[in-house]
């Protein structure tokens, strides 16, 4: 009976991964991630009514901070200093919006084992989360996940593609 449950769970997870892998990001013709300094709004913010933990009708801004994507060097979990002002802007946003929640997702390129890459992605996300905590953001506002190499931003197999996949993403979580 347990084997059947694990089999069903495996099928469910495989289906979810397949659906996620086949979907395209809106506005991206090649499925690649766009890296830029423009204003970025949190996903789904236009359709939501409030952040988790925030009362409906309580005011909030729909403009998330700049640079919700941070790239890393190969096999490294050290955040480049050029990203610190942007991470600090994220921290200020979270401190002034205590109802806001953010998921920090760590990613790697395709090189290396699954286990190693999940651990590396987690170290990358933890690095950014620790900067937020040191800046005064509540632990309850931060959730860290690692996808390792399972959710590439770019499906290419060259160094430029690998560089886009070695990243941490901020994903603001909202409730309806």
Swiss-Prot record:
InterPro entries: Bact_OuterMem_StrucFunc, OMP_bac, OmpA-like, OMPA-like_CS, OmpA-like_sf, Pal, Pal_lipo_C. One of its GO terms (cellular component) is cell outer membrane. A lipid is attached at residue 22 (S-diacylglycerol cysteine). Keywords: Cell cycle, Cell division, Cell outer membrane, Lipoprotein, Membrane, Palmitate, Signal. A lipid is attached at residue 22 (N-palmitoyl cysteine). Residues 1-21 form the signal peptide. It is a lipid-anchor. Residues 60-176 form the OmpA-like domain. It comes from the Bacteria. PANTHER family: LIPOPROTEIN YIAD-RELATED, STATOR ELEMENT OF FLAGELLAR MOTOR COMPLEX. The Tol-Pal system is composed of five core proteins: the inner membrane proteins TolA, TolQ and TolR, the periplasmic protein TolB and the outer membrane protein Pal. They form a network linking the inner and outer membranes and the peptidoglycan layer. NCBIfam families: Pal_lipo. Part of the Tol-Pal system, which plays a role in outer membrane invagination during cell division and is important for maintaining outer membrane integrity. Very strongly associated with the peptidoglycan. This is Peptidoglycan-associated lipoprotein. The gene is pal.
């Amino acid at each position: 009976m347990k084997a059947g449950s694990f089999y069903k769970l495996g099928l469910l997870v495989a289906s979810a991964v397949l659906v996620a892998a086949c979907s395209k990001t809106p506005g991206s013709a090649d499925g690649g991630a766009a890296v830029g300094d423009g204003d970025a709004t949190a996903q789904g913010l236009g359709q939501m009514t409030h952040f988790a933990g925030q009362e409906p009708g309580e005011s909030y801004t729909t403009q998330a901070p700049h640079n919700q994507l941070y790239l890393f060097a190969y096999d490294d979990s050290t955040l480049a200093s050029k990203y610190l002002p942007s991470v600090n802007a994220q921290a200020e946003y979270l401190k002034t919006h205590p109802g806001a929640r953010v998921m920090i997702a760590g990613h790697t390129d395709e090189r290396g084992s699954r286990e190693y890459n999940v651990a590396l992605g987690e170290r990358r996300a933890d690095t950014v989360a620790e900067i937020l905590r040191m800046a005064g953001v509540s632990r309850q506002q931060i959730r860290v996940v690692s996808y390792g190499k399972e959710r590439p931003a770019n499906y290419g197999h060259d160094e430029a593609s690998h560089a886009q996949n070695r990243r941490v993403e901020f994903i603001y979580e909202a409730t309806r």
